[in-house]
């Protein structure tokens, strides 16, 4: 199996951070930290996160429709999510359910050996966010 189509959307963690920043009147760094570590009000999931997930699913659905309109015989068998926002709890399951296609969080770092000087857990947490950078680095080395 190989990757036959890849697309990048300009909708993701940055937009969620901006929405958190505006809604809760936080600085950019505080909003980003709250997004990653929690600590927002109890209504965060319903007021911020669920609408964000719904919008993200709409973006993915649109990208899939564009792909299918240009390819008659190829079927998408799985979505691999990347970027920091892909680690949101339940996002892959929500996408799979809404779009009726398997979805998973990609993690290119899980196959790498980590130097002992690096905190392996912190490194592993960044896997989905590093997919594009590592892919570009590997393509340059060929």
Predicted regions and their residues:
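Hydrophobic/aromatic-enriched cytosolic interaction surfaces used to assemble or bind macromolecules
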Residues: 1-142
């Amino acid at each position: 199996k190989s990757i036959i189509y890849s697309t990048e959307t300009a909708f993701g963690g940055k937009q969620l951070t901006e929405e958190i920043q505006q809604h809760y009147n936080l600085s950019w760094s505080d909003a980003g930290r709250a997004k990653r570590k929690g600590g927002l009000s109890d209504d965060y999931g319903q007021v911020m996160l669920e609408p964000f997930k719904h919008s993200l699913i709409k973006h993915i659905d649109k990208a899939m429709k564009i792909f299918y309109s240009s390819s008659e015989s190829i079927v998408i068998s799985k979505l691999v999510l990347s970027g920091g926002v892909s680690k949101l709890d339940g996002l892959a399951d929500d996408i799979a359910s809404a779009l009726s296609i398997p979805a998973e969080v990609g993690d290119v770092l899980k196959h790498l050996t980590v130097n002992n000087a690096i905190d392996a857990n912190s490194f592993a947490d960044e896997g989905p966010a590093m997919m594009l950078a590592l892919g570009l680095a590997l393509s340059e080395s060929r």
